[in-house]
């Protein structure tokens, strides 16, 4: 019984860590996406100029 609780606790801990890591990665992707969205119109303008 005790072993089962330990395994369940470890599984829950791994799920929580994985979820927080995914949220962190998503926020990083949003920042990078916003940065490249700001930069993109300038690139399009330069391509049109040529």
Curated annotation (Swiss-Prot):
Location of the protein in the cell: Secreted
Record keywords: Secreted, Signal, Toxin
Signal sequence bounds: 1-19
Please tell me whether the keyword Transferase is annotated for this protein. Answer: no
Coiled-coil stretches, from where to where? none
Q: Name one GO molecular function term.
A: toxin activity
Superkingdom = Eukaryota
Annotated GO CC locations: extracellular region
The answer to whether UniProt assigns keyword Signal to this entry is yes
Name this polypeptide is given? U37-theraphotoxin-Cg1a
Mind giving the lineage of the organism this protein is from?
Eukaryota, Metazoa, Ecdysozoa, Arthropoda, Chelicerata
